[in-house]
């Protein structure tokens, strides 16, 4: 049975209750304040997880990117090779486009076109 309008005005129906097991917004703010108050370094805080725990060290050391160890001549040779390959791809693509156009627009069909009266 439905309640009257007067009974429904005071209580919103779709608001979640705080005691349903949903954590409130205050504990993460307090945790951040406690980290700064305890004197921990800000860098340690950013390196750790979201909960403020320190990050686990990686099992193997991070290597530098190989591009940093190349001399400029090797980089220029690589760029020249990429440019040559792009030109070759462009030529082959144009060849296929031309072949496709010729096949579609040729007057001699591989099979006769029959029109039924």
Swiss-Prot record:
Keywords: Coiled coil, Nucleus, Transcription, Transcription regulation
Subcellular location: Nucleus
Disordered: region residues: 1-81
Record's keyword annotation contains Coiled coil: yes
Coiled coil region boundaries: 73-100
InterPro entries reported for this sequence: TF_A-like/BEX (IPR021156)
Origin superkingdom: Eukaryota
Expression sites (tissue/organ): Highly expressed in kidney. Moderately expressed in heart and lung. Low expression in brain and liver. Expression is up-regulated in nephrectomized kidney.
GO cellular component, one term: nucleus
Keyword Membrane: no
Primary site of residence: nucleus
Biased composition (Basic and acidic residues): 41-81
One Pfam family from the record: BEX
Function of the protein: May be involved in transcriptional regulation.
Protein name (database record): Transcription elongation factor A protein-like 8
């Amino acid at each position: 049975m439905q309640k009257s309008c007067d009974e429904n005005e005071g209580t919103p129906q779709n608001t979640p209750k705080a005691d349903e097991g949903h954590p409130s917004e205050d504990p993460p703010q307090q945790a951040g304040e406690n980290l700064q108050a305890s004197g921990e370094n800000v860098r340690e805080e950013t390196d750790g997880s979201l909960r403020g725990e320190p990050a686990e060290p990686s099992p193997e050391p991070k290597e530098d990117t190989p591009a940093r160890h190349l001399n400029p001549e090797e980089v220029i040779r690589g760029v020249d090779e990429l440019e040559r390959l792009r030109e070759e791809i462009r030529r082959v693509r144009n060849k296929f486009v031309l072949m496709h156009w010729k096949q579609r627009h040729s007057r001699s069909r591989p099979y006769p076109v029959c029109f039924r009266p």
